[in-house]
Amino acid sequence: MSASTHDYLIIGQGLAGSLLARELVALDRRVLVIDDHYKSSSSTVAGGLINPVTGKRLALQPGIDYLLPAAQRCYRGLEQKAGLRFFFPLPMLRVFQNEEELQFFERRMQDPAYAPYIQPLPENALLRDVHAPFGGCIQTRCGFLRLEEMLEWLRYQFMIGDAYQRTDYNHEELTVSSSGVEWHGCRAKSVIFCEGFRGALNPWFSHLPFQLARGEILDGVPDRTLHPHDHIINAGRWLLPEPDGRYRFGATMEWDRLDTRVTEEARRTLMAAFHERFPDTGFTVTGQRAGIRPATTDRHPFIGSHHEQPAVRIFNGFGAKGGLLIPWYAKQFASHLVNDEPLDTAADIRRYD
């Protein structure tokens, strides 16, 4: 590669790196995205769920009033430009796992902040195909992303803009100085690491408390139409209906084993979970995928500059909520880099200095 000058090198073209690069390009900054074609990205195996209310306590995502509109604007804008569909809004049928979850739901129904996002079941018939002894509810303003298709389209946009290089990145090949960074003859003012779980091995950011979580999902087809077929079903595991009639089902959660090889053990676990919740339905597996979620111990992203090398930056740690969080944070971080706007203090890595 001949010597060239950019404003930013972005390492990783998962959802975080892609949307940050897009925001910087929109601010007339020259970027070069370096990626190994998703070898380490959890984005291509994620469910791509957009879900404002999560967890056993049915907790509303902090900042949802600005995070969700930012995500919707981002994905609709990409769809309009591409002429393709990436974002599929769908309600979610939430199946309670126990009496405690039912009690949390009843409390949330008394809180006006939850009114736009949760509703009682309009009819018990929605549960006719699901084993649900504790009942359930409807979660609104949910949906999912076709992440693989969206990232492929974005990669093509970076390529035609001379802003993409497919290669394996090695930290030892990066030179950092007071004037910026250099990699393979390419000089830039700054490097931004969007490496997903590999961020935990980054020599500049390995001190940050990542909480990596490995997960596997199944692709497949049920042997009959499940009711409701036009909802995401969250019954401990999520069952996500694809537009072509296929489903995604997942996910497992492991903290000890951190590789991306699929396992027979996970397949058996997921199939047992499927049959427990959908006892009268068969499921033919057509594919299986594994990935590692780059979550954090305090559940906030890692964004900002290295405390000793300000040209070295990170944009990572979005865990399983990347589809909802990344659009707003990408725009904010780009504004911080270009216009010196302040970072969200909860996400700024200076909290660990």
Label for each model-derived stretch:
Residues L49-D129, P133:
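Dinucleotide-binding Rossmann-like beta1-alpha1 core, especially the glycine-rich loop
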Residues C137-S190, C194, R198:
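Helical element adjacent to the flavin cofactor pocket in flavoenzyme catalytic cores
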